[in-house]
């Protein structure tokens, strides 16, 4: 069990680890008891010390910034939190530490714009499930996300469960090279639950946007959503010079009165407002009203550039026009949408409007949170649909031979292609989906002035990928290798705001065996409290 709230004593969760640990000691909880950040033995090749000037030397640098460009072999200079130079053979003097990146790919960290991290202990539980029992009668199983995760599991979470789930899920993604997350956890049953989530996000040591959403299925007497947003913002998120930001959750499926209140609170605080927008929840007419500026109980809520919409499946032309014209952001979770019956991921619709999405993981109770899967799924889905559109235009086989030796004369030889229509979207490329997973993620979270590319002046959120491993070598094309071949085993080093968090394949300052025990204890409690039997070979 996580030590955050031992003996059922809720603790005040401060905006820094130092204050948090002091508070723990003051309540009789020794900081050593946490054992989350145990010292590691010295390595033969140690990472740069925090704040030390260093250069990443000799890697294949993919900056994702057209003005900076790409380099087959180049260096990245980091001073403090920021990138100060990118280019070949940088002259950095003798005081800079050197990270040897030969045989490696150096690129920006991935950015996940929608992740329900509180569900980490429920990984794989819903691998065969769909979103909701929609009454279709199709054989999709009775174990659905809405009925099980939100209505059975979510209500029994304690603050200590929130903490360890958020912490472990965040560290797992950090290990995978995801340096920024928008945490969308509908687990805010009480202010203590919210504080536990925020503290875990801080303790993960990566950049995050804290999404303040409702508490799913709760009847807690201390339920304070959405009013507690004001306290949370004032306590944790007023500084712009930190790794953390806040986003206001404003789910329109909660009803006109509640979402109007949450949207108005968010806009008063100057926050982005995020919501799941998808047809299985009957949201199409609500989005149509918002597109007309007639949303909410008073019919005065409209769309804006401060909106971040998740999924956007099954929406009308009017809804899409409103989102486009407002300059709102869209996050697509391709693998989840394809598997859980959210509807067709709207990548072709976005292309037709000149829009691009960011990428997101959604839920690990069904699918993996690694970003290589997100990028591949995006590219594969768009291409299978587009390729079939192209094939459907083909005319009957033409007798012209392919020119291949021994080609049987009775086998169709070639399709005759008409001129393709002007509005046919372009096939996505590996570079496109890399942009979706980095630059577009930063834009979606209003962080593009800080991160998303290897641009001098931006903060150093950098990943170093090993291209010498057996699944990649020989390296022939950098974007293709990252998207088409790599997985988390290739993520060798991860840097957040200049600080090395993963080094030579290992997370730093983390006692994973201890955290794993805490996560498993939380899992056991959650299943028991929800009245759901644990069965390793059944999907219920």
Segment roles from a protein language model:
Residues 121-162, 281-306, 326-329, 373, ...:
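Active-site gating loops and adjacent loop-to-helix segments of metal-dependent hydrolytic enzymes
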Residues 438, 443, 459-510, 514-516:
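C-terminal cap of metal-dependent C-N hydrolases
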Residues 45, 187-320:
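Metal-coordinating catalytic core of metallo-dependent amide/deamination hydrolases
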Residues 24, 29, 33-40, 44-54, ...:
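Histidine-rich, glycine-flanked metal-binding segment
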Residues 300-301, 348-469, 485:
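His/Asp/Glu-enriched, well-ordered alpha-helical/loop segment
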Residues 125-184, 189-206, 227-239, 520-522:
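Alpha-helical scaffold segments that flank or form the walls of functional sites
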Residues 1-19:
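N-terminal secretory signal peptides
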């Amino acid at each position: 069990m996580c030590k955050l709230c031992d003996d059922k004593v809720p603790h005040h969760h401060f905006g820094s680890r130092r204050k948090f640990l002091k508070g723990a000691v003051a309540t009789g909880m020794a900081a050593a008891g946490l054992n989350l950040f145990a010292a590691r033995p010295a390595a033969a090749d140690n990472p740069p010390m925090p704040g030390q000037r260093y250069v990443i030397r000799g890697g294949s640098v993919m900056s994702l910034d057209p003005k900076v460009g790409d380099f087959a072999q180049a260096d990245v200079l980091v001073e403090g939190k920021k990138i100060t130079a990118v280019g070949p053979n940088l002259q950095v003097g003798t005081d800079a530490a050197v990270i040897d990146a030969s045989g490696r790919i150096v690129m920006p960290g991935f950015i996940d714009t929608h992740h329900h991290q509180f569900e980490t202990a429920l990984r794989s539980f819903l691998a065969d499930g769909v979103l909701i029992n929609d009454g279709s009668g199709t054989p999709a199983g009775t174990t659905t996300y809405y009925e099980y995760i939100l209505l059975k599991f979510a209500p029994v979470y304690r603050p200590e469960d929130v903490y360890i789930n958020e912490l472990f899920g965040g560290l797992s993604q950090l290990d995978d090279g995801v340096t920024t997350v928008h945490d969308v956890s509908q687990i805010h049953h009480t202010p203590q639950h919210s504080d536990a989530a925020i503290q875990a996000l801080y303790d993960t040591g990566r950049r995050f946007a804290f999404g303040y959403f409702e508490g799913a299925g709760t009847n807690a007497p201390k339920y304070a959503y959405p009013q507690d947003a004001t306290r949370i913002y004032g306590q944790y998120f007023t500084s712009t010079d930190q790794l953390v930001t806040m986003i206001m959750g404003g789910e329109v499926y909660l009803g006109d009165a509640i979402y109007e209140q949450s949207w108005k609170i968010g806009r008063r605080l100057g926050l982005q407002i995020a919501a799941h927008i998808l047809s299985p929840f009957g949201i199409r007419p609500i989005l149509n009203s918002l597109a007309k500026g007639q949303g909410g109980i008073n019919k005065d809520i409209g769309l804006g550039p401060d909106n971040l919409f998740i999924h956007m499946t099954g929406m009308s032309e009017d809804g899409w026009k409103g989102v486009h014209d407002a300059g709102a952001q869209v996050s697509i979770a391709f693998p989840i949408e394809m598997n859980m019956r959210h509807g067709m991921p709207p990548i072709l619709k976005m292309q037709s409007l000149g829009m691009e999405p960011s990428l997101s993981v959604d839920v690990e109770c069904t699918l993996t949170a690694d970003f290589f899967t997100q990028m591949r799924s995006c590219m594969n889905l768009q291409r299978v649909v587009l390729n079939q559109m192209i094939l459907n235009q083909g005319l009957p086989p033409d007798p012209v031979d392919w020119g291949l030796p021994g080609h049987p004369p009775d086998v169709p030889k070639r399709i005759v292609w008409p001129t393709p229509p002007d509005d046919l979207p372009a096939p996505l490329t590996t570079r496109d989906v890399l942009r979706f997973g980095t630059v577009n993620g930063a834009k979606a979270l209003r962080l593009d002035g800080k991160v998303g590319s290897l641009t001098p002046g931006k903060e150093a959120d950098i990943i170093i990928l090993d291209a010498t491993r057996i699944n990649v070598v020989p390296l022939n094309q950098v974007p293709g290798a990252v998207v088409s071949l790599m997985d988390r085993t290739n993520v060798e080093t991860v840097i957040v705001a200049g600080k090395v968090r993963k080094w030579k394949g290992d997370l730093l300052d983390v006692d994973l065996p201890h955290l794993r025990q805490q996560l498993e204890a939380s899992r056991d409690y959650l299943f028991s409290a929800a009245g759901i039997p644990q069965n390793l070979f059944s999907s219920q």
